[in-house]
Amino acid sequence: MIEENNTQSRKNDYYIVEDEKGEKFLLPYYAETFRVLMDDKDTIRDVLNSVLGLDRDHEIIDLDYEFEKPIDVFMPEDDPVRLDVWVSTRDKRYFNIEMQNWSHSFFYDRIWLYNAYQTLRGKYEYNRSPYFKSLGKEERKYRFYELPETVSIWFCNFRILNSEKIFKDTWAVYSEDEVSRSSGKEPARPLVTKNRYIIVDLPNFVQLRKSIGSREDFWLKLLSQGPLNVPESEDPVFAGARNRLRVSRMNPDLFKALEDKMFDEKHVREAIEAEAYLKGEAAGKAAGEANERSRNEAANAARDKKIAEYLRSIGVSAEGVSTALAIK
């Protein structure tokens, strides 16, 4: 029993921290603990409004959300990937919020893939919304190709931005010509503002922001460093978020179910393992080919030596020997 408890304690160390009073908290940057943190409309709304920097005229008022939204279009082996948090708002905006701990060779492809699905899904839901259905026939024809606003937000617990001077960047579609002609005074503008990616580099945030000066700072510090590194607050949204991460408030059965899926990033893990295997296989093949070349070169050198010795023994000049060896 002692050995079992020690094993459990070591396992818990990965995603549980304990304060000086002995209170245990979940670290919110794992797959399941992130959902525990985000399982609240007010939290999602506040995270989105602060990270996107939305003013009162554009802030999100009401929303619905769904965890592990499946990408229900064809994927290899019919094995769907899932969006961490899918959010739709009352004013017909669609967001995907991802918490990621691992990079891999096709991480950028993954970002584009998720956004492509998000765009299609957003259009699908937009066309079936009460708003769109309430439009007149000609208005619906006019808006046949209209896309709603779709934003992908990626919280990356690894370095992803090229610059170490920023922790957040917006990616969008730009014209190469406009980018080439842009300057500091007249920067290039995205061709499409409805569809964009917000990339948050949490390691950069930790280096750049040592204290909390905004609501965005609170959320990013909580996500990157955990609940022990943010102050207790009387703000109901902040207090509620921190409280949801208390281990003591969780039902034991729910906690066990959560624990079983804590590291369930199947596709990411498999991609990283497969990449390592393929690189090892390629390195082994290259080493084998190098050894084969080395053996062939040694055999050729030994053969040339014997030919040269024979030619010299029958009186062929040094120039003639060189000419003969060159003819192969």
Each model region followed by its residue ranges:
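Accessory alpha/beta interaction modules
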Residues: 1-196, 206, 267, 275, ...
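Short, charged alpha-helical interaction segments and adjacent helix-coil junctions
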Residues: 2-25, 86, 95-100, 204, ...
